[in-house]
């Protein structure tokens, strides 16, 4: 085997792919199981996979044999017609019988041997087939009745004549006979169960031990386990053994409990994180004020005195060229509007106006950047001064789309830009 092995399993043991374990290893597995070792311990000791150990032990507890089944080819059919008829008979005698009980009866009555006994899954498959055949027979009888009723062309008075000839009313009589037969044979089944061999009973008890049962913990045990879980989520083997001696539980059960408790704690922690994130989300995204803050922001009051247009002059300048240019323009109605329209003075630093960047020149004293309001925006203007300063040096506009326009510094060429600004 060492020269022909085709792989190494997770535990470091060698195996031949597609070939069963040697009989010596199988015998050791059974001996360790009888000595009280768990399948997981046997797997580590013999370096055999846990699934292989469980399968060999399960077959041993059911059949008492450690020999492997047939390799290659098709397995011999164990559900022969004789076995199927016996299974159907047992099911008729006791409709609530289990598959493993049928299997034990087949062995005890000598219908099958350990070599050709069908497995529990095979017996369940036979029972499903029998149930489906019975249901199909009942459905066929109903279809026959419907076909006969649909094919009848006589009057309503002749239709009841078909009912006695159908197969459906006959079924309750047949079921009644089966129930009577079952009632008569239940005593036989009880007596046959009482005559089971001691070996089958021992195997049955070992099989019961192999099957898992849910452990019900007392309140004291749960409190002790929870207290230990608060101390550490991963107790070592010494802590588990100490806890097992304290609360009178197997160490394996305690290990399983901690594994399940850790999984529950992870689920609860995930839910707590989700709730924490959900509670923190609204503080970052205000919903009620999103429209007002993103579209229409209120314009704050200016902190510095601001002067605006008056009806007498547009630009507070002494230059005759600019004065003549302005006087040549047609009068704008925006300078003589009513006083009842509200106006909020904007901040000059905002970009909501046309900025006429007029550089300083020798003929202009203290000239800086001026703001000018286009005609279509003048409806929001007030003819009275908005600032507190007496000097009229800068004109203001209302909020709007701002486009900076730079005007050259030469004074004689300034007149060509005024029509463009209108």
Curated annotation (Swiss-Prot):
UniProt-annotated stretches for the region Required for suppression of NFATC1-mediated transcription: 345-422
Residue span of region Disordered: 162-201, 269-311
Region (PAI subdomain): 7-63
Annotated spans, RED subdomain: 82-130
GO molecular function terms attached to this record: DNA-binding transcription factor activity, RNA polymerase II-specific; RNA polymerase II cis-regulatory region sequence-specific DNA binding; transcription cis-regulatory region binding; ubiquitin-protein transferase activity
Single Gene Ontology BP annotation: forebrain development
Biased composition (Low complexity): 281-294
InterPro entries per record: HD, Homeobox_CS, Homeodomain-like_sf, PAIRED_DNA-bd_dom, Paired_dom, PAX_fam, WH-like_DNA-bd_sf
GO CC entries: nucleus
Keywords associated with the record: Developmental protein, Differentiation, DNA-binding, Homeobox, Nucleus, Paired box, Transcription, Transcription regulation, Ubl conjugation
SMART domains according to UniProt: HOX, PAX
Secretion signal span: none
Cited Pfam families: Homeodomain, PAX
UniProt DNA-binding region: 4-130, 210-269
Subcellular localization(s) per the UniProt record: Nucleus
PTM text: Ubiquitinated by TRIM11, leading to ubiquitination and proteasomal degradation.
UniProt similarity note: Belongs to the paired homeobox family.
Assembly information from the UniProt record: Interacts with MAF and MAFB. Interacts with TRIM11; this interaction leads to ubiquitination and proteasomal degradation, as well as inhibition of transactivation, possibly in part by preventing PAX6 binding to consensus DNA sequences. Interacts with TLE6/GRG6.
Job of this protein: Transcription factor with important functions in the development of the eye, nose, central nervous system and pancreas. Required for the differentiation of pancreatic islet alpha cells. Competes with PAX4 in binding to a common element in the glucagon, insulin and somatostatin promoters. Regulates specification of the ventral neuron subtypes by establishing the correct progenitor domains. Acts as a transcriptional repressor of NFATC1-mediated gene expression.
Descriptive protein name: Paired box protein Pax-6
Originating organism: Bos taurus (Bovine)
Gene symbol of the encoding locus: PAX6
């Amino acid at each position: 085997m060492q020269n022909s092995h085709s792989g190494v399993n997770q535990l470091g043991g060698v195996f031949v792919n597609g070939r069963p374990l040697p009989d010596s290893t199988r015998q050791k597995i059974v001996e360790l199981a009888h000595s009280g070792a768990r399948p997981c311990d046997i797997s580590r000791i013999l370096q055999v996979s846990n699934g292989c150990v469980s399968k060999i032990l399960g077959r041993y507890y059911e059949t008492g044999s450690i020999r492997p089944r047939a390799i290659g080819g098709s397995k011999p059919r164990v559900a022969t017609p004789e076995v199927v008829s016996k299974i159907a008979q047992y099911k008729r005698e006791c409709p609530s019988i289990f598959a493993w009980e049928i299997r034990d009866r087949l062995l005890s009555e000598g219908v099958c041997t350990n070599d050709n006994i069908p497995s529990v899954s095979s017996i369940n498959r036979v029972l499903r087939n029998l149930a489906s055949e019975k249901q199909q027979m009942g459905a066929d009888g109903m279809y026959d009745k419907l076909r006969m009723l649909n094919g009848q062309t006589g009057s309503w008075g002749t239709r009841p004549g078909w009912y006695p000839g159908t197969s459906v009313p006959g079924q309750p009589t047949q079921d009644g006979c089966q129930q009577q037969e079952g009632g008569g044979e239940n005593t036989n089944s009880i007596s046959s169960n009482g005559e089971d061999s001691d070996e089958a009973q021992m195997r049955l008890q070992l099989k019961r031990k192999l099957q898992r049962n849910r452990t019900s913990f007392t309140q004291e045990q749960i409190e002790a386990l929870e207290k230990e879980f608060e101390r550490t989520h991963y107790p070592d083997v010494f802590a588990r053994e100490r806890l097992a001696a304290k609360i009178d539980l197997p160490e394996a059960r305690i290990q399983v409990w901690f594994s399940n408790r850790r999984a529950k704690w992870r689920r609860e922690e995930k839910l707590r994180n989700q709730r924490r994130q959900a509670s923190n989300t609204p503080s970052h995204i205000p919903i009620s004020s999103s429209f007002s803050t993103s579209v229409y922001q209120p314009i704050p009051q200016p902190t510095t005195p601001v002067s605006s247009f008056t009806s007498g002059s547009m630009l507070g300048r002494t230059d005759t060229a600019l004065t003549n240019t302005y006087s040549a323009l047609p009068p704008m109605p925006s300078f003589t509007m009513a006083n009842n329209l509200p106006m909020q003075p904007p901040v000059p630093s905002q970009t909501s106006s046309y900025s006429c960047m007029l550089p300083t020149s020798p003929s202009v004293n203290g000239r800086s950047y001026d703001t000018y309001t286009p005609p279509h925006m003048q409806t929001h203007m007030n003819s009275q001064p908005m600032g507190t300063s007496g000097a009229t040096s800068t004109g203001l506009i209302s909020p709007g789309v701002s486009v900076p326009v730079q005007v050259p510094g030469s004074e004689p060429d300034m007149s060509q830009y005024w029509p463009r600004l209108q």
